[in-house]
A protein has these predicted regions:
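N-terminal capping segments
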Residues: 1-57, 92-94
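Intrinsically disordered/low-complexity terminal segments and short unstructured peptides
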Residues: 60-61, 77, 107
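Membrane-embedded alpha-helical bundles of multi-pass integral membrane proteins
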Residues: 62-66
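Short alpha-helix capping/helix-loop boundary micro-motifs
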Residues: 71-80
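Loop/turn positions that initiate beta-strands
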Residues: 85-87
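A short, compositionally biased micro-patch
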Residues: 89-92, 101
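Catalytic Cys-His active-site segments of thiol-dependent hydrolases/isopeptidases
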Residues: 97-108
Length: 108
């Protein structure tokens, strides 16, 4: 069963890890020189998979993520609705997860 709280906390743990970095070249969670890399969409893909929304990680991109997330049960909302922690925000070229600072010291 999918668990948004698990996906959310996985994202926070990764963002707080000093051995995680940003790379589009190594975006599929590859570890190079002791640093594990993601880009914005591959991090969302990893966290959604960890949370049980996806059976295996497709390493989606911002261009392809819409279909994967809708298929996993996520729903689109309008920009004027209040954001909740764990909501995934998307625009052309970037995605991120809404973060509540009371839940830890990192950013998503």
């Amino acid at each position: 069963m999918a668990d948004l709280t698990l996906a959310y906390h996985t994202c926070i743990e990764i963002c707080n890890n000093p051995n995680v970095g940003y790379s589009q070249t190594y975006r599929a969670g590859q570890t190079v020189g002791g640093i594990t890399y993601y880009d914005c969409s591959s991090l969302m893909s990893y966290c959604c998979t960890a949370g049980g929304f996806l059976a295996s990680n497709p390493w989606f991109t911002t261009r392809s993520m819409d279909g994967y997330l809708i298929g996993a049960g996520f729903q689109k909302s309008t920009a004027n609705q209040p954001w909740k922690k764990g909501d995934i925000l998307w625009r052309s070229g970037h995605t991120e997860m809404v973060y509540n600072p009371a839940d830890g010291g990192g950013y998503t």
